[in-house]
A protein has these predicted regions:
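Long, non-globular segments of proteins
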Residues: 1-220
Length: 220
């Protein structure tokens, strides 16, 4: 109230404006840049993954979306916290011959940034033993991948260290990086095999031997 008993409307409006000024801005909607998202989901309904390899839309530029080395997806530097949405985006991933990764729908292709791998392998299923062993991995986006000739493993030596980074081909040119704990479990399954006169340490899966490193380098 003012001194003359009237309501101080201007003061109330000032408080509202001040509250609006300090309120955090609404989170950006990561689905906004993708006009063809509904078409992509409709194309795959009841049929598994969308056929992104058969779609050839025009390139519509890059968007501010990134898959971090820790497997977390970001849009405009904010984590995308809705796992179903991340899972949906992951089904639209395609890595082309140019080495770049895109989200692809029937009507658009947009570039995104990938810090390391497209997925993380977060659990491992082991069946059988020896050369009859079969390894399956589940990714952070719920893909299940059996390691075989079509889905090989590769081991990359880290720059400046003697460590190895293990990757699995999930589909197309998309790979999953094993988490450290899963890699330790994988190493426990390793055996030595002679290849072209040299002893290699590696693992078996689906009748294929996947060499990690020369046995001499790891003291075997």
């Amino acid at each position: 109230m003012t001194n003359d008993g009237t309501a101080d409307l201007d003061g109330g409006q000032a408080e509202v404006k001040e509250a609006q000024a300090v309120a955090p801005p609404p989170a950006a909607d990561p689905t906004q840049p993708l006009r063809g998202l509904s078409e992509a989901t409709a194309a795959s309904r009841g049929r598994g993954l969308p056929p992104v390899d058969r779609w050839n839309p025009e390139f519509c530029g890059d968007i501010d979306m990134r898959i971090g080395a820790d497997g977390i997806w970001y849009y405009q530097n904010s984590p995308i916290g809705r796992k179903p949405l991340v899972r949906l985006f992951s089904t639209l991933l395609r890595k082309d011959e140019d080495g770049k990764t895109y989200l692809v729908t029937p009507v658009e292709k947009v570039g995104i940034t990938v810090d390391d791998a497209h997925f993380l392998a977060v659990s491992m299923i082991v069946e059988g033993e020896g050369d009859a062993q079969v390894l399956r991995f589940v990714t952070n986006c719920d893909d299940e991948v059996t390691v075989d000739a079509d889905h090989p493993m590769r081991f990359v030596r880290q720059k400046g260290t003697d460590g190895l980074k293990p990757y699995i081909l999930v589909r197309g040119r998309l790979e999953a990086l094993l988490t450290r704990s899963i890699f330790y479990d994988l190493v426990e399954l390793g055996v030595t095999r002679t290849i072209d006169g040299a002893d290699w340490f590696g693992v078996w899966s689906s009748g294929q031997f996947f060499p990690m490193a020369p046995a001499a380098e790891i003291g075997l």
